[in-house]
Amino acid sequence: LQAYVVQHENEGYVLVKDIEQKRGKVRAVALYNPSEQPCSFTVPLTDLEFEGTVKVRDLVKHRDLGKVDGALKQEVPAHGAMILRIEGKKRIEPTVYEAEWAYLPLFDDLGKNPNAVRYTPQEGTSGKMIVGYLGGQPENYAEWKEVYSEKGGQYRMTVQYTQGAGRQLELTVN
């Protein structure tokens, strides 16, 4: 599985992915700072899908950083990255699925089609990005393939989207 962005902190990014086992109790976390200034990260463990205390190891320096409760706090120098192994006792279900995490069959990052599906920065959104130019044809959709619920059942879902005049949102849940 590919890592995905779970948080933006100032100019930095927090990426996460399962390692060792899908939906397991060990995850890799990357704190990436592409900016010209140091970046202080404060990442709630719930954003990493953990509850309680976790053990943290710096995978680049091969060093244990101890136990963390509540939030992971690290400072990353300018143009730097920190790759961590996080191990917890209790993995929790995700509560947010960002547009940027969706599978987009017609995504085109080459820029050849001016109306192709694309990611666009937008302040005020939870992930600081939106997916634009969806729709117009049946194969131009967004699909979240890794939605997870341990027990299933009924859930309340909130969808936030922007639209132009005369457009609609169609939602299918299996």
Where in the sequence are the language-model features?
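Glycan-recognition and catalytic regions of carbohydrate-active enzymes
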Residues: 1-35, 115-128
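Structural beta-strand/beta-sheet cores of well-ordered domains, especially the beta-sheet scaffolds
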Residues: 12, 25-27, 39-41, 52, ...
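Flexible loop/turn segments at secondary-structure boundaries
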Residues: 12, 23, 36-39, 64-66, ...
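Short, glycine-/Ser/Thr-/acidic-enriched flexible segments
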Residues: 21, 34-37, 61, 89-90
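Buried hydrophobic-core signal for structured, non-transmembrane domains
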Residues: 29-31, 56, 157
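Short, loop-centered acidic/histidine patches that primarily coordinate divalent metals
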Residues: 32-34, 46, 59, 162
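Surface-exposed beta-strand/loop patches in extracellular or lumenal glycoproteins
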Residues: 34-50
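Extracytoplasmic
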Residues: 48-53, 63-66, 70-81, 85-174
